[in-house]
């Protein structure tokens, strides 16, 4: 099945035979070829952009998993941001609905958002829900700086990943996401997360 093939490729890529590539560098060429041949494909409109809903996060199917949890948390949120050089990042961070218009993201302070926080500027953000499994795996994988999560997802799925321009933010988002929540992160606004 397609899913089994993707899983097999994931395992092979996470445990490459470095010794083999050192002895026989040409054996690594297929992986390099795949990386170069899989840039994301820009498309006009994404699946998650067909219907625009009013600014009310409480209307979305975001569960509260346990009775004592501090709120509703997005399951497998694909968080899209970009740095000052325009390089996009796709990660997975806990996302808690605080009210109709605020979604709290649990950042690691030393990571991607630190640059925006140091400058005291808002960071454009898109939180995407749904999409192909290779995209979800790509978001949580430790990748080298010169390989984007979108490229890696393309390699895993053996086809260029379609991306589309976000409607309200200067970001490219996965075109196959079911739901796209667009907004910004203000480094001067913080809230306590949870309880869990």
What is each model feature region?
Residues 1-196:
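Extended, highly charged
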């Amino acid at each position: 099945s397609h899913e089994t093939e993707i899983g097999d490729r994931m395992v092979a890529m996470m445990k490459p035979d470095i010794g083999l590539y050192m002895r026989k560098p040409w054996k690594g060429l297929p992986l390099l070829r795949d990386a170069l041949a899989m840039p994301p494909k820009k498309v006009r409109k994404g699946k998650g952009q067909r219907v625009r809903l009013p600014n009310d996060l409480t209307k979305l199917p975001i569960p509260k998993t346990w009775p004592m949890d501090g709120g509703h948390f997005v399951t497998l949120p694909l968080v899209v941001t970009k740095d000052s050089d325009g390089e996009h990042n796709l990660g997975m961070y806990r996302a808690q609905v605080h009210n109709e218009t605020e979604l709290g993201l649990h950042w690691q302070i030393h990571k991607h958002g630190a640059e925006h926080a140091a400058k005291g500027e808002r960071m454009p953000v898109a939180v995407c829900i749904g999409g192909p499994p290779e995209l979800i795996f790509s978001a949580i994988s430790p990748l080298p700086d010169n390989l984007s999560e979108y490229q890696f997802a393309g390699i895993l799925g053996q086809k260029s990943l379609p991306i589309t321009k976000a409607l309200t933010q200067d970001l490219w988002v996965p075109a196959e996401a079911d739901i796209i929540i667009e907004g910004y992160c203000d480094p001067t606004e913080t809230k306590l997360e949870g309880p869990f």
